[in-house]
Amino acid sequence: MFKKSYRHNIALVGASEFFGFFGITSFWLLFLSQHGMSFGQIGILESLFHLTSLLSEVPSGVLADRFTYRTNLYLGRLMSILSCLFMLFGQGHFWIYAFGMVLNAWAYNFDSGTSTAMLFESAKEAGLEDKFLKFSSFVSAVAEATRTLGAVVAGFFVHGLLDMTYVIQIFFSLIVIILITMMKEPAFK
C-alpha cells in the first residue's frame, strides 16, 4: 500500500508536472481556425486568456494562502478539464470558446507557484531543503521537456483530429488528480 510522505511528494510533483503540462493542446490556434474562428476572433480569445491570467494572478495567490496546496492543485486541474470540455463542445461558438479560455487561464493561475511551493515545503519537511534547487530544476526541466514532447505528439493530430488533443488533456488531468490525492499536505504553510 502506498504511504503518503514528503519524500514521495517530490516525485509526485514531478509526475504531475509531466501530465499536467504535457503541451498536447499546443495547436489551439489551429484548432480554433479549424472550428471556424477568424484570425481576429482568435486574437481576441488569446487576449482574453492573457488578460484573465493577469487579473487573476493575485486573487489566485490569495486563495493559495487561504486554502491548502492540494486544494489549489485540484482546482487547477478541474479548471483544465472544464476548459477542455468547453473547447470540445464549442462547435464554432465564440462565447463558448471565450469561457473555455477564461477557465484555461484560471487553470494556469491555480497551479502558478503552488506546485513549486508544495515542492519546497515537502523538501523542507523531508529534511532535504538543501536539495530544493536541484529538485526544482529537475521539475522545471520535466515541465519544459513535456511541453515540447506534447507539441510533437499533437502534430500527429493536426489533420482534422485536434479534438483528440483535448480528450487526451482531460485524461492526463484525471491522472494528475490521482497524483494530487497521493500527496501529503505539508503540516504548515
Kindly label every feature range from the protein language model.
Residues 50-58, 144-148, 152:
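Residue-level signature of mid-helix packing/kink "hotspots" within the transmembrane helices
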Residues 4-7, 88-101:
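Helix-loop junctions at membrane interfaces in 12-TM secondary transporters
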Residues 102-143:
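Cytoplasmic helix-loop-helix junction between adjacent transmembrane helices
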Residues 74, 78-92:
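C-terminal ends and interior cores of transmembrane alpha-helices
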Residues 29, 34, 147-168:
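Transmembrane alpha-helix termini and helix-breaking/packing motifs in multi-pass membrane transporters
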Residues 2-55:
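Helix-loop boundary and gating motifs at the non-cytosolic
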Residues 18, 83, 94-111:
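Hydrophobic core of transmembrane alpha-helices in multi-pass small-molecule transporters
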Residues 169-189:
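Helix-loop junctions on the cytosolic side of multi-pass membrane transporters
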